Amino acid sequence: MEFDPAKINTSSIDHVTILQYIDEPNDIRLTVCIIRNINNITYYINITKINTHLANQFRAWKKRIAGRDYITNLSRDTGIQQSKLTETIRNCQKNRNIYGLYIHYNLVINVVIDWITDVIVQSILRGLVNWYIANNTYTPNNTTTISELDIIKILDKYEDVYRVSKEKECGICYEVVYSKRLENDRYFGLLDSCNHIFCITCINIWHKTRRETGASDNCPICRTRFRNITMSKFYKLVN
C-alpha cells in the first residue's frame, strides 16, 4: 500500500503540529505529533501517540549499550546535547491530544520504526515524517546567503538576533556562516564554555580530531575547555 498525501489532515496546538492519516477503506488511522525546534531547525516526534508501548521500549533501549552508543554518536553528529534529544509533554486536560514522549526524528526513522510490526504502518509513518519535513524545510539557493525573509518566517521575535547572526564569521574558516555554500553548513556550533563563533561543520571537525588524538576539548581560540556543542541557527541561544 502506497503512502497518499491526500489522506493527511493537519492541525496544530500551541507549538505542536498534528498529522492525522486517515484511510477508512483500509481501516487505517495514524496520528503523528511533531515539534519543530526553533534553535537548530530539527524535528521531534511523539512516539507515545503512535503506540503507547513504543515509549517504554525506547526508555529500555537507551539504557542498553547499543542505545547509549547510538545516542552518543547522534549527539556528537548533530551538536545537540543528549538530554535535548528527547522532550516530554505531560498528560493533562490541556495537553490530552499532544502529550507524550517526543524524540529526535533520526531516532524514529532509524531505530523506533523497526519496532513496529505492521509494515503498512511503518510505511505510512515514514511517509508522514518525510512529507512533513519536505514541506517544512527552507531551501535557499546554495549560491546565495540565507534570506532574511526565511528567518522572519520562523518567528518575528528572532529578527534582532538574526540581524547580528548574519554578519558573524566562523573563527576557524573565517567565512560568514550564513554565506557558506551548503545549507547544512549554515549553522553555528555554540560552546558551553565561551562565546567564540564557529560554524557547526568546523567545530565538529575540530572536536572529532581532538577526540581521535586524545586531546582535551578546548576552544580553538581561547583554549577554554568545553563539554558540549549546541547546533543553532543563531550565534547565541534564544528562548
From Swiss-Prot:
Signal peptide positions on this chain: none
Miscellaneous notes: The vaccinia strains LC16m0 and LC16m8 encode a full-length E3 ubiquitin ligase p28 unlike the majority of the vaccinia strains.
Class of enzymatic activity (EC top level): transferase
EC code(s) of this entry: 2.3.2.27
Zinc finger regions, RING-type: 170-223
Disulphide-bridged cysteine pairs: none
Family annotation (InterPro entries): E3_ubiquitin-prot_ligase_p28 (IPR016398), KilA/APSES_HTH (IPR018004), KilA_N (IPR017880), MKRN-like (IPR045072), Znf_RING (IPR001841), Znf_RING/FYVE/PHD (IPR013083), Znf_RING_CS (IPR017907)
Gene designation: OPG021
SMART domains: RING
Similarity-based family: Belongs to the orthopoxvirus OPG021 family.
GO biological process: protein polyubiquitination; symbiont-mediated perturbation of host apoptosis; symbiont-mediated perturbation of host ubiquitin-like protein modification
Keyword annotations of the record: Host cytoplasm, Host-virus interaction, Metal-binding, Modulation of host cell apoptosis by virus, Modulation of host ubiquitin pathway by viral E3 ligase, Modulation of host ubiquitin pathway by virus, Transferase, Ubl conjugation pathway, Zinc, Zinc-finger
SUPFAM superfamilies: RING/U-box
MF annotations from Gene Ontology: acid-amino acid ligase activity; ubiquitin protein ligase activity; zinc ion binding
Domain KilA-N: from-to ranges: 21-131
Keyword Transmembrane: no
Chief location category: host cell
Protein purpose: RING-finger E3 ubiquitin ligase which catalyzes the formation of both 'Lys-48'- and 'Lys-63'-linked polyubiquitin chains. Plays an important role in virulence by acting as an anti-apoptotic factor.
Catalytic activity: S-ubiquitinyl-[E2 ubiquitin-conjugating enzyme]-L-cysteine + [acceptor protein]-L-lysine = [E2 ubiquitin-conjugating enzyme]-L-cysteine + N(6)-ubiquitinyl-[acceptor protein]-L-lysine
Name the record gives this protein: Host range factor p28
Domain of life according to the entry: Viruses
Compartments, record wording: Host cytoplasm
GO cellular component: host cell cytoplasm
